[in-house]
Swiss-Prot record:
<dbReference type="InterPro" id="IPR018520">
    <property type="entry name" value="UPP_synth-like_CS"/>
</dbReference>
<protein>
    <recommendedName>
        <fullName>Isoprenyl transferase</fullName>
        <ecNumber>2.5.1.-</ecNumber>
    </recommendedName>
</protein>
<comment type="similarity">
    <text>Belongs to the UPP synthase family.</text>
</comment>
<feature type="active site" description="Proton acceptor">
    <location>
        <position position="77"/>
    </location>
</feature>
<feature type="binding site">
    <location>
        <position position="78"/>
    </location>
    <ligand>
        <name>substrate</name>
    </ligand>
</feature>
<feature type="binding site">
    <location>
        <begin position="30"/>
        <end position="33"/>
    </location>
    <ligand>
        <name>substrate</name>
    </ligand>
</feature>
<feature type="binding site">
    <location>
        <position position="42"/>
    </location>
    <ligand>
        <name>substrate</name>
    </ligand>
</feature>
<feature type="binding site">
    <location>
        <begin position="203"/>
        <end position="205"/>
    </location>
    <ligand>
        <name>substrate</name>
    </ligand>
</feature>
<feature type="binding site">
    <location>
        <position position="46"/>
    </location>
    <ligand>
        <name>substrate</name>
    </ligand>
</feature>
<feature type="binding site">
    <location>
        <position position="197"/>
    </location>
    <ligand>
        <name>substrate</name>
    </ligand>
</feature>
<keyword id="KW-0479">Metal-binding</keyword>
<keyword id="KW-0808">Transferase</keyword>
<feature type="binding site">
    <location>
        <position position="29"/>
    </location>
    <ligand>
        <name>Mg(2+)</name>
    </ligand>
</feature>
<dbReference type="GO" id="GO:0016094">
    <property type="term" value="P:polyprenol biosynthetic process"/>
</dbReference>
<feature type="binding site">
    <location>
        <position position="216"/>
    </location>
    <ligand>
        <name>Mg(2+)</name>
    </ligand>
</feature>
<feature type="binding site">
    <location>
        <position position="34"/>
    </location>
    <ligand>
        <name>substrate</name>
    </ligand>
</feature>
<feature type="active site">
    <location>
        <position position="29"/>
    </location>
</feature>
Length: 249
């Protein structure tokens, strides 16, 4: 039986609240292919993708999921056509400005993770403003990976730790997973329980390489702009049927 979108404002009855993932991460893939299929410019796929993300964020809030992390812009995305990159930077800035008031009212705490210093200054300013305005919110935690690369994240953490050892602030035998995680972009954010990737591609694409050590992965052929609450419901049903062993028998 297919559950309709209109029936999904509250947690579906076939999902057990105690088995929901606390933290969901998404690789939002397929905006360009969606636009091409519709006979539209690629930028229209990105615009439609923003709408899909906004609804997923509200769905997570409505259904009681505590955290959502979205892969918005990777370090490799700078290689895309300049016109597309410039559009994305402008789009991020405009969406932040337009949605901030609503995020505050809906008790969303927003955080950006990645090498933010390389972003346009105007976008950095909007990011800082949104994080400051929502820092005391205690509803859903929404992390946006922007200019993010998993390998780069690990490298910068290693450099930061090595510098502290060199300065005598940290001893080599004090370095453990907890210390390492404090130096990641995602410091203070719990690891994802579930990673969803749209468009059918079966790879991590340099996303949350450390954090996904024991996370469950769900792949759907649905392109990101078409990912809705019905698709999310399918992903959560699949997740709840799995047995998480964390390396144990």
């Amino acid at each position: 039986m297919t559950i309709q979108q209109t029936e999904l404002q509250e947690l579906p009855l076939d999902l057990k609240r105690e088995l929901l993932p606390k933290h969901v991460a998404v690789i939002m893939d397929g905006n360009g292919r969606w636009a091409k299929r519709q006979g539209l410019p690629r930028i229209m796929g990105h615009k439609r993708g923003v709408d899909a993300l906004k609804d997923l964020l509200r769905c997570c809030r409505d259904w009681g999921i505590q955290a959502l992390t979205a892969y918005a812009f990777s370090t490799e995305n700078w290689k895309r056509p300049q016109e597309e990159v410039e559009f994305l930077m402008t789009l991020f800035q405009r969406v932040l400005r337009q949605e901030l008031r609503e995020m505050v009212e809906e008790n969303v705490q927003i955080q950006f993770v990645g090498n933010l210093a390389a972003l346009p200054r105007s976008l950095q300013a909007e990011i800082s403003r949104s994080m400051e305005a929502t820092k005391n919110n205690r509803g859903i935690r929404f992390s946006v990976a922007t200019n993010y690369g998993g390998r780069q994240e690990i490298l910068q953490a290693c450099r930061a730790i090595a510098q502290k050892v060199q300065q005598g602030l940290l001893q080599p035998d004090e370095i453990d997973e907890e210390v390492f995680e404090r130096h990641l972009y995602t410091a203070g954010i719990a690891d994802p329980d579930l990673l969803i990737r749209t468009s059918g591609e079966m790879r991590l694409s340099n996303f949350l390489l450390w954090q996904m050590a024991y996370g469950e992965i769900y792949i759907t052929d649905t392109l990101w702009p078409d990912f809705d609450r019905t698709e999310f419901h399918r992903a959560l049903c699949a997740y709840q049927q799995r047995e998480r062993r964390f390396g144990k028998v």
